[in-house]
Amino acid sequence: FSLEQYVGKKYVVMFFYPMDFTFVCPTELHAFQQKLQEFERRNVAVVGCSVDSQFSHFAWLNQDKNKGGIHGVTYPLVSDFSKTISENFGVLAADYITNESGELISRGNPVAYRGLFLIDKEGLIRHYVINDLPLGRNVDEALRMVDALQHFEEYGEVCPANWSKGKDAMKATNAGVSNYLSHH
């Protein structure tokens, strides 16, 4: 798997989750699946990633939803068994110790925090959020951030707090913010 396949073609929402066969994770994966067409209409590829093996992903994909599985999920799930991707994105939840050589060594079995990265068509991270392990994310918020980025790219207007598609945005100037605030 490589994010390079999307550069110049699609936006990407890449999200990390701790582990297959757990508790909050299947609710998130199903929530992304339920909104997948909305992401696709916005030219966004959705990609999930955990530190599990591809074999674990396959088994979980074949387990029925009513048994905690993710049967029916159709977007790619990346296996980060080496934990390199999670480490590179800064989402690896690990305790580290320093060995005699001064190297950081992780203890236990690190997993990924619930990181979400919105990557533009040029391959730049434009938004990210990292939730602690017990805190599920809001897929509608991910869609809202896609809308905000695409609005900015199309119109050059910045999107204020709580902005949603179809609402007023503003020019990134003193006059723009003054005008916006005087009407809101």
PLM feature spans:
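Chalcogenol-based redox active-site neighborhoods
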Residues: F1-H184
